[in-house]
Amino acid sequence: MSRRCELSGKAVMSGNNVSHANRKTRRRFLPNLCQVTLISDALGRQFSLRVSAHALRSVEHNGGLDPFLLKASDAQLSSRALKLKRAIEKVQAVAA
């Protein structure tokens, strides 16, 4: 399981710890990932996703999982989230 957010694409970054004496040692910046269960209103199902805290706030800000996925670009979504987005689009096209 990679340390990458399934909705926002946030991943591990690398950089330096810099001491007061300006010595640099390598370090990793890990994303704040949470295992959450989100509900799709269009599909009427629950989905367990590994999401960063930043993406979770964005989902709530957009009004839920469905509006967030429909607004999100395909490049930043994982393959599971992209399949979910396509399924939501298909259900909404049939309902319209």
Curated annotation (Swiss-Prot):
Protein family according to the UniProt entry: Belongs to the bacterial ribosomal protein bL28 family.
GO molecular function: structural constituent of ribosome
Residues spanning the signal sequence: none
GO BP, one annotated term: translation
Organism per entry: Parvibaculum lavamentivorans (strain DS-1 / DSM 13023 / NCIMB 13966)
The gene coding this protein: rpmB
Keyword Ribonucleoprotein: yes
Protein name: Large ribosomal subunit protein bL28
Key words of the record: Ribonucleoprotein, Ribosomal protein
A cellular component annotation (GO) from this entry: cytosolic large ribosomal subunit
PANTHER family (UniProt xref): 39S RIBOSOMAL PROTEIN L28, MITOCHONDRIAL, LARGE RIBOSOMAL SUBUNIT PROTEIN BL28M
InterPro entries: Ribosomal_bL28, Ribosomal_bL28/bL31-like_sf, Ribosomal_bL28_bact-type, Ribosomal_bL28_sf
Gene3D superfamilies to which the protein is assigned, alphabetical: Ribosomal protein L28/L24
